[in-house]
Amino acid sequence: MAVAGLLLRPPPCVAMCTPSPSPFPSSQRRRRRRLTLAQPYCTLGLSFVSGRHHRFLLRRRRRTESKRTSRGTGVYASLFGVGAPEALVIGVVALLVFGPKGLAEVARNLGKTLRAFQPTIRELQDVSREFRSTLEREIGLDEVPPSMNYRPPTMNNSQQPAIDQSSDDKPEAAPYTSEELIKVTEEQLAASAAAAWNTQEPPPSQQKEAAATSESNDGAISRGSDGAGAAMSEPNRNISEKTETER
C-alpha cells in the first residue's frame, strides 16, 4: 500500500502546475501557469549567467593585478626627480614660450654658465670629500671600543705550544696484502742476518791491530829460535875443537 501511495503521488512540478481555484480570471491563471512551468529553466539560466559573470570578473581582476605588477617592476629613468614625460612637457612649454631661437640662446647661456662654474663645482666637490673623510675618520676613531685597541702580548716561538699534527697529517694505514707481508718478512730476515754478520766480524781497525800483533809475535819467535840455534852451535864447536886437539 505504501508503494502504491508513492507511485500514485503526483510529482512536485505537476502539483505546482495544477491550477487551483482562485478568484483570478482565466488569462491570469494561464500566465501564472506558464511562469511556474518556466521557473526551473529560469533558475538554470540565472545560475549560468551568474557563473559566467563571475569568471569574467576573475579574469578582469587577474589582468589588472598583472598590469599593476608590471608597472611596479618597470624601470623609470628620471633626472632630479623629473621623468621623461615631465621633461617632454617642460620642453614643449619652453619652446612655446621662448621660441626656437630664444630656446637656442637660453641653452647657450646655460652652457656658458655651467662652464664658468665648473672649477667652483670641482672645488666644492673636493672640499666636501675632504670634510666627509675627516668626519668618517673622527667617527671611526671615536666608535672604536677600548677592547679593540688592546693587543695581546706576543709569544716567542719557544713559548708557543707545539701542535701535534702527526695524527692529522698521517693518512690512515691501508691493510697489508699477502705479497707485502712476504716482502716485509724477507726484509726483516735479511736485516737480522746482516746484523748478526756484523757482530761476528770485527771492524777493520781491530783486524789491522790483530795482524800487526801477530806479525810482531812471529818475528819474536823467529828471533828466539835463531838465538837458541846459535847458542847450541857454539858448544858443539868447542867440543869438536877439543877432540881435535886431543888427537
Swiss-Prot record:
What InterPro entries does the entry give? TatA/B/E, TatA/E
Stromal topological domain: 100-247
Lipid metabolism as a keyword of this entry, yes or no, is no
User: Transit peptide located at which residues?
Assistant: 1-76
GO cellular component annotations, sorted alphabetically?
Answer: chloroplast thylakoid membrane
Membrane-crossing residue ranges in chain numbering: 79-99
Q: Which Gene3D superfamilies match?
A: 1.20.5.3310
**Keywords, alphabetical:** Chloroplast, Membrane, Plastid, Protein transport, Thylakoid, Transit peptide, Translocation, Transmembrane, Transmembrane helix, Transport
Q: Where is the composition biased (Polar residues)?
A: 154-165
- Which GO annotations describe the biological process of this protein? protein transport by the Tat complex
Q: Where is this region: Disordered?
A: 137-247
* Keyword Membrane attributed: yes
Coarse class of the primary localization is: plastid
Per the record, membrane topology reads: Single-pass membrane protein
Q: Which residues lie on this side of the membrane: Lumenal?
A: 77-78
Where does the protein end up?
Answer: Plastid, Chloroplast thylakoid membrane
Relate the protein's function as given in its record: Part of the twin-arginine translocation (Tat) system that transports large folded proteins containing a characteristic twin-arginine motif in their signal peptide across the thylakoid membrane. Involved in delta pH-dependent protein transport required for chloroplast development, especially thylakoid membrane formation. TATC and TATB mediate precursor recognition, whereas TATA facilitates translocation.
Q: Which family does it belong to?
A: Belongs to the TatB family.
Q: State the oligomer form and interacting partners.
A: In thylakoid membranes, TATC and TATB form a large receptor complex, containing about eight TATC-TATB pairs, which binds the precursor protein. Twin arginine signal peptide promotes pH-triggered docking of TATA oligomers to TATC-TATB receptor complex, inducing a conformational switch of TATA that results in activation of the translocase. TATA dissociates from TATC-TATB upon completion of translocation.
NCBIfam families named in the record? tatAE
Q: Which PANTHER family match?
A: SEC-INDEPENDENT PROTEIN TRANSLOCASE PROTEIN TATA, CHLOROPLASTIC (PTHR33162), SEC-INDEPENDENT PROTEIN TRANSLOCASE PROTEIN TATB, CHLOROPLASTIC (PTHR33162:SF3)
What name goes with this protein?
Sec-independent protein translocase protein TATB, chloroplastic
Species this protein is from: Oryza sativa subsp. japonica (Rice)
